[in-house]
Amino acid sequence: MLVERKTMQGIISAVRRNSLAENAGIKAGEKLCAVNGVSVHDIIELSYLVADEQIVLTIEDSECRQRQIVIEKYTDEELGLEFEAAVFDGVTTCYNNCVFCFVDQMIPGMRESLYVRDDDYRLSFLYGNFITLTNMKEEDFEQIIKTHMSPLYI
């Protein structure tokens, strides 16, 4: 069973002092909806979308009002944004029932996040989480190929 990813925005958890984002008036708690008109699904995609000298950010405030901000920058210059989560559209979870699943074999009483049966290739790339590749959509494989995402832990 494949999970449809929902469109979400990246919730901004912090804005670094004296950064491009702070100078543009972006605040913690606001949401990044798009870069140059393209919806952003995760911090990996964000890094590709902002690698330009001029970008247009679509930001949503706490009252659901959107505004566009034009930022001129060096191609490798960071915006100074930090996000609540690395993926903005929800984590893909594993629906397999493998007898050898290490998550199912963990002892009780550990921290909650260890019991999440994530199967998200983005978390594999970012944090070294293991994935099965069985819960992926065609677009996921295309994104891996397009961005040369490696290593992935299978």
Predicted regions and their residues:
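Conserved PDZ fold ligand-binding element
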Residues: N23-H41
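Conserved Radical SAM active-site core
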Residues: C64-I69, K73-I154
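A residue-level detector for short acidic-glycine micro-motifs
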Residues: A14-R17, A34, Y48, D61
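PDZ/PDZ-like peptide-tail recognition elements
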Residues: M1-G10, Y48, E53, T58-I59, ...
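Short, Lys/Arg- and Gly-enriched loop/turn segments at beta-strand edges
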Residues: V38-L46, R65-Q68
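Short, structured beta-strand/loop micro-motifs enriched in basic residues and often containing a Trp
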Residues: M8-R17, G37-V40
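Terminal peptide-recognition signature
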Residues: A21, G29-L32, L57, C101
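Short, surface-exposed secondary-structure edge patches
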Residues: L20-G25, S47-Y48
